[in-house]
A protein has these predicted regions:
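Positively charged n-region of N-terminal signal peptides that target proteins for export
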Residues: 1-4
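Hydrophobic alpha-helical segments, principally membrane-spanning helices and signal/leader peptides
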Residues: 23-24, 254
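Short, linear, compositionally biased motifs with a strong N-terminal bias
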Residues: 10-11
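Expand to "…catalyze enediolate/carbanion chemistry for C-C bond making/breaking, isomerization
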Residues: 19-21, 276
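N-terminal signal peptide c-region/cleavage motif recognized by signal peptidases
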Residues: 14-16
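A cross-kingdom marker for long, charged
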Residues: 234-294
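Structured, acidic catalytic/metal-binding patches in enzyme active sites
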Residues: 21, 27-34, 40-235, 239
Length: 294
């Protein structure tokens, strides 16, 4: 999901090299503007205080749309669906997906950074362990990171407290499918092993992505996302399509009707915003004026 240095957002003047996370969307039949805010799951909540126009965007919108409705995701029945999707088939164990040497390497890393024995995860899909390991790495290496404080959740909570509608661009089922079912188990296993054998690189990339986000530099964030090391650990085009680009296109199809209904604050991961196939460009191609907000 993160990979080749390329200059982006020099595509047109309206989406020029701006260091912004908040964007205004107007025109194309909208009576009042909507806004798009990019988030980052490793960033502290304090980033919102550095975006001076954010309160204006909050005040001028009547609903918040995120990737998911976070309250829905936390319902017991949906938590159960996610837990089930994380489990390996009955005839497969985690250990069976690796050589003994590979398994031992991963076990040592999991013990070091997560403080648990890998044997406890023997029925979990590798993708689920990779996600948990990434959180553990972030907690050890990123100052101020608190997995219990997420920007996406904060925006939805504020909207609910103000009596505004909260909506989601995707279903829980779709996100679960992307996370745990879009890759073969052998590919998930390889990516877990890649993470375990490239811990320093993983931490460095997370740090640089978070620094780029805190600088509100979408250009740099995209460049880091597209970096490649030219081996099997690199994200494939198909994986990027599943994780980023197909979702961008789907959101861009939904948003005209949503924004027409009411002025909307759209809150999605910042990695979805920049580039030729980014959400900002897709909205602009539909005839909207897309402007950075200070």
């Amino acid at each position: 999901m993160k990979k080749t240095l390329a200059l982006v957002m020099l595509l047109c003047i309206a989406l020029g090299a701006q260091a912004q996370l908040l964007w205004k969307v107007s025109g194309n039949g909208l009576d009042r503007p909507s806004y798009v805010m990019g988030t980052h799951h490793l960033a502290p909540l304090s980033i919102k205080d550095s975006i001076s126009a954010l309160q204006q965007a909050i005040d001028q919108t009547e609903q918040v749309y995120g990737e998911l409705v976070m309250d829905e995701a936390m319902k017991p029945e949906n938590m159960m669906k996610m837990q089930q999707a994380m489990m390996l088939p009955a005839d497969t164990t985690l250990k069976s997906l690796f050589t003994q040497a590979q398994y031992d390497t991963i076990a040592a890393v999991v013990k070091n950074y997560m403080g648990v024995d890998l044997a406890l995860f023997n029925k979990l899909k590798p993708a689920a362990i990779t996600t948990q390991l990434a959180v553990a790495l972030a907690m050890k290496s990123l100052k101020g990171f608190n997995p219990q404080e997420q920007l996406d959740t904060w925006f939805q909570t504020q909207a609910r407290q103000a009596g505004k509608k909260v909506g989601g661009l995707e279903s829980i089922a779709l996100q679960v499918d992307v996370l745990y079912n879009s890759q073969a188990l052998t590919r998930q296993a390889l990516l877990l092993y890649c993470t375990a054998t490239h811990i320093d690189q993983s931490i460095d990339q997370s740090l640089r992505m978070t620094q780029a986000y805190m600088k509100q530099d979408l250009d740099e964030l995209l460049a880091i996302t597209e970096e490649k090391v030219n081996n099997a650990c690199d994200s494939t085009p198909e994986e990027m399509d599943a994780l980023i680009y197909r979702r961008n296109a789907d959101w861009a199809r939904q948003l005209p009707a949503i924004m027409k209904q009411s002025p909307t604050l759209v809150v999605v991961g910042a990695g979805h915003l920049p580039g030729q196939r980014g959400l900002l460009k897709l909205l602009q191609e539909q005839g909207y004026t897309v402007e950075p907000m200070n």
